[in-house]
Amino acid sequence: NLDKPIINFRLEGAISTMTRVPNMVDGPTYMKMFNEAVSRPGCDVSPYSQEKIDGTIAGLNPYIYPNVDWFDEIFNKSAFSERANFNIRGGSSKMDYFMSASFKHSNGHLKSLSKDYFSYNNNVRNYNYDFINNLNISATRTTKISLGLNLSVADKKSPLMDVNDIFQLSMEANPVDFPVRFPANMSDRDFVLWGDKLGGIHGQGWYRNPVAEYVTGYKTNLRTTITANFKLAQELDMITKGLKFTGLFSFKNYSSSSTERSASYNHYYMSSYDPSSMEYKITRIGDEQSTALTNDGSRNGDRKMYFQAILDYNRIFKEVHDLNIMFLYNQEQYDINGPTTLFSSLPQRKQGVAG
């Protein structure tokens, strides 16, 4: 028995850091080391000219002499998460209850770059909500009832590209081949002029701009799970001593809704420039692409119902003979939400008897 309810509230915050952060060299160091790596006796070919190295060191026009730390451009070295929990319990000899509500929010290590270029934020964002409600009632001296209602919600938003692939691209792109983007005034088009370069290791004829790949598009996923259970325990001593009936009914419904919004992007390379006037021209790689977001989505889920009844007789005669008889019946039904074929629309059913 509790004179008054017991209430608990807990709020936590956490900072996560990367276990190991790669140290990236700057552009001039990269070019010098690259020239040294490919040089050999009798060959004085240098992929990067001294003029480009000197211009990068001097910090001249960053579109002609880019010096991009792609990892630092995309990733934060730490991320913050928070969680909160509220619960209350109480009751008396006739009834007791427990209720709990939990909330959790976490972000990834990506920087929120997409909102600098578009109207959406595609950074990793996870929200989790959990609700638990349990109620136990002693209706009579021989009758006990239990009811449980639970709800779990997971709401996730993330870039269209997997974070591992984004990390790999940031490791592949070198700091001096192209800038993140070119100035908007170099074209009369209203889309972002992403930097790029002809060639590449992906077999497409060009390199892949890590920032452009990251910020273009996003996906969302909402998952909900609802469970409910009802239990009845009835002693049947009025019929015969030691006889007891227990009934259980449970229900679970799971649903998932996913949406993907994707778009192409237009990328350019510096086709020519004049070192004396610092004027340059850019050329689009491939055909012009539509930057309008396209939408694709899917829904799925399932539900399950379960019923169980137990009739149990347990009695000791004259403190010597122990008699125990049990009869059990159960049945289960499983359905798919939104079936797409005749076969998948048919419920799966099971029945069982034991004694």
Q: Where in the sequence are the language-model features?
A:
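One-face residue pattern on beta-strands with alternating periodicity enriched for small/polar residues
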Residues: 14, 130-132, 227-231, 248, ...
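Membrane-proximal, glycine/serine-rich, low-complexity loop/turn segments characteristic
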Residues: 1-225, 231-237
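Flexible, surface-exposed loop regions and adjacent strand-edge segments
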Residues: 24-30, 114-121, 162-171, 261-271, ...
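Short, solvent-exposed beta-strand-terminating loops
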Residues: 16-20, 36, 102, 257-267, ...
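Extended hydrophobic secondary-structure segments that form protein cores and membrane-embedded regions
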Residues: 9, 244-253, 324-331
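Outer-membrane beta-barrel transmembrane domain signature of Gram-negative proteins
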Residues: 66-91, 180-189, 263-355
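Transmembrane beta-barrel domains of bacterial outer-membrane proteins
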Residues: 109, 132, 139, 242-252, ...
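Sequence/structural signature of outer-membrane beta-barrel proteins
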Residues: 16, 106-108, 154-156, 254-256, ...
